[in-house]
Amino acid sequence: LVFVAGGIGLAPLRSLIWNVLDNREDYGKLDIVYGARSPADLVYKYDLDTWPTDDRFNMAGTLARGADKWQGTGGFVPHGPGEVAPSAQDAVAVVCGPPIMIRFTFPILDKLGFTPEQMITTLEKRMKCGIGKCGRCNIGNLYVCRDGPVFTYAQIKDFISKEY
């Protein structure tokens, strides 16, 4: 499993990460990439302080604007998977964060060998009414509120660079 989160995108992934950690024997290799614009934008700082010392997984952290006490690297979240270099064999990558981060993370995962079916993201930012009536959340022929908000890259790849 590979979790890639940017900014507040760690919030929806955190419970999934903890579930994987609580049931570690059921999963293979685990990589977590998390980053934010600045130290003030980091969420779950206690986890971020303890996770890098946890030998059950690899952790890579990035900040767009550096900080004195930051343990990770400078840069943008989409570059993180390249640093961790996760194996795509029998793996799934879960991506959650700002739209621009999501858009630029998929090509990097693709270069690492992940297929569009192995890449999962959530697009709830697009939802408006939440019941499929307003049509504002459509992406191609899909409605985020009805068909998602979780999608594989295979489902949205033809639309994500144009509309998201």
Annotate the PLM regions.
Residues 1-128:
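FNR/FR-type flavoprotein reductase catalytic core
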Residues 34, 61-64, 140, 144-147, ...:
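Short histidine
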Residues 100, 124-149:
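Local cysteine-cluster metal-coordination motifs and their immediate loop/turn environment
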Residues 42, 131, 155:
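Short acidic, gly/pro-rich beta-turn/loop elements at beta-sheet edges
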Residues 135, 140, 151-164:
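Short Fe-S-cluster ligation motifs
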